[in-house]
Amino acid sequence: MSLKKFRPITPGTRFRVAASYDDVTTSTPEKSLVVSIKKSGGRNSQGKMTMRYIGGGHKQQYRIIDFKRDKHAIPAVVKTIEYDPNRTARIALLSYADGEKRYIIAPTGLEVGNTILSGPGIAPEVGNCLPLSDIPLGTVVHNIELKPGKGAAMARSAGTYAQLVAREGKYATLKLPSGEMRMVLVVCYASIGTVSNADHMNLTKGKAGATRWAGRRPRVRGVAMNPVDHPMGGGEGRSSGGHPRSRKGLYAKGGKTRSANKYSKNMIVKKRVNKRLSK
């Protein structure tokens, strides 16, 4: 995907950087793989607001994505590469030899007409999905399972990937985009390659309205609220609000949010460093 800049004929286009969508081959999704979703506006089933700053936005249809890739040893041909409004990556429509159609997250380099497979013992080529036990060390992967058979959970957003760095016994060690080194069972499946649309990180909305199109409302600062609404609210005139705190009164700015007793902590070999991997 390439980027598109605009002539500054309006304030909203002056700094806007948008996607060119030259990698998208069709604008009409597969009807059998689309379901309608109703916007919640940040409210739960009782009508009470449980998430602030959500509302409005363009109407969207959800594309059903195959994260399990459980049609083993059945070849599938890539029919289209499509835009998905529900995620940052592109999606690919597969047509299997038995007639079934499914959507998958499209990896970089996958093109219309390519044939891909999933299952044990297949070639580790871009788009193929196989268990970590069959993937050569050093291979870049995405759509990685955390629990066998549950479906992909890691490295699913645009441009992300992980690298298989070691394998010992029933565990494989992966280096994640955050720098974290994590052990995963070798029977878990992963797809070969990196996720498409890596230029997503370089997009610039250009105006506040573009954020509203995505269904996000303005976020009010805590120091601009009253004391009844936020621990940092109130004061005479403009004030700093004191020590930065969350709305619940917990210290903000760098505090640990992960539970120290989380069951999967033993799977983490090295903690993340908050820096993206460099190829």
Swiss-Prot record:
GO cellular component, one term: large ribosomal subunit
GO biological process: cytoplasmic translation
GO MF term set: rRNA binding; structural constituent of ribosome; transferase activity
InterPro entries found in the cross-reference section: NA-bd_OB-fold, Rib_uL2_dom2, Ribosomal_uL2, Ribosomal_uL2_bac/org-type, Ribosomal_uL2_C, Ribosomal_uL2_CS, Ribosomal_uL2_dom3, Ribosomal_uL2_RNA-bd_dom
Annotated region (Disordered), positions in chain: 223-279
PROSITE patterns noted in UniProt: RIBOSOMAL_L2
Gene3D superfamilies for the chain: 2.30.30.30, Nucleic acid-binding proteins, Ribosomal protein L2, domain 3
Bias kind Basic residues: ranges: 268-279
Record keyword Magnesium present: no
Keywords attached to this entry: Ribonucleoprotein, Ribosomal protein, RNA-binding, rRNA-binding
Complex and partners: Part of the 50S ribosomal subunit. Forms a bridge to the 30S subunit in the 70S ribosome.
PANTHER family xrefs: LARGE RIBOSOMAL SUBUNIT PROTEIN UL2M (PTHR13691:SF5), RIBOSOMAL PROTEIN L2 (PTHR13691)
Family that this chain belongs to: Belongs to the universal ribosomal protein uL2 family.
Cross-referenced HAMAP family: Ribosomal_uL2_B (MF_01320_B)
Protein task: One of the primary rRNA binding proteins. Required for association of the 30S and 50S subunits to form the 70S ribosome, for tRNA binding and peptide bond formation. It has been suggested to have peptidyltransferase activity; this is somewhat controversial. Makes several contacts with the 16S rRNA in the 70S ribosome.
Name of the protein this chain belongs to: Large ribosomal subunit protein uL2
Gene: rplB
